[in-house]
């Protein structure tokens, strides 16, 4: 996943996020994620593009932090199963944009939810579906000082 993060960061730095500072906080000991590389690139590109747009609309000195970590105690119940699963691998994208509007925050992973004039509101919905198809979960935390999107995965067998 770190290779995918670096690939997407390079695309962003050479395109839509030229003026944004990227900070990396990777845990090199994490195991690989097994999945569709192209779909994971699509997810990360969408999240980083959203972060860069939030920063630009907030006119802050832009910074996006890409991080990975091992979370030893994350267990959740999925709606499709009664058993709890462990999702210890966490990959995050955090920005210092203006945060997500309260009016749409609860529904940001639903289709057609957007606060952008040019957007269709499908990016986070598609990202969420892709992560679910990889047996993971995507979470969001937001304040007026920025947003953090975290992707949680199980350890692959």
Each PLM stretch: what is its role?
Residues 21-31, 71:
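Conserved catalytic submotifs in the C-terminal HATPase_c
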Residues 1-9, 67-69:
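A conserved beta-strand-to-alpha-helix junction within the catalytic ATP-binding
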Residues 32-35, 115:
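Conserved micro-motifs of the catalytic ATP-binding
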Residues 123, 127:
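Short alpha-helical Gxxx[C/S/T] motif in the catalytic ATP-binding
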Residues 135-136, 140:
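Conserved glycine-rich
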Residues 86-88, 100-111:
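Short conserved segment of the HATPase_c
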Residues 131-132:
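Detector for a conserved hydrophobic position within an alpha-helical segment of the HATPase_c
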Residues 61-74:
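Short beta-strand/loop element within the Bergerat-fold HATPase_c
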């Amino acid at each position: 996943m770190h290779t995918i993060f670096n690939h997407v960061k390079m695309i962003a730095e050479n395109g839509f996020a030229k003026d944004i500072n990227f900070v990396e906080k990777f845990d090199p000991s994490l195991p690989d994620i097994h999945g569709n590389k192209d779909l994971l690139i699509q997810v990360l590109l969408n999240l980083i593009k959203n972060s860069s747009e939030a920063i630009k609309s907030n006119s802050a000195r832009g910074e996006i932090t890409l991080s990975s970590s091992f979370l030893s105690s994350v267990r959740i119940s999925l709606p499709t199963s009664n058993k709890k699963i462990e999702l210890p691998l966490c990959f995050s994208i955090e920005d210092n944009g203006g945060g997500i509007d309260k009016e749409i925050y609860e529904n940001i992973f639903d289709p057609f939810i957007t606060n952008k004039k040019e957007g269709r509101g499908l990016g986070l919905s598609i990202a969420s579906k892709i992560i679910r198809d990889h047996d993971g979960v995507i979470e969001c935390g937001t304040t007026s000082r920025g947003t953090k999107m975290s992707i949680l995965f199980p350890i692959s067998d």
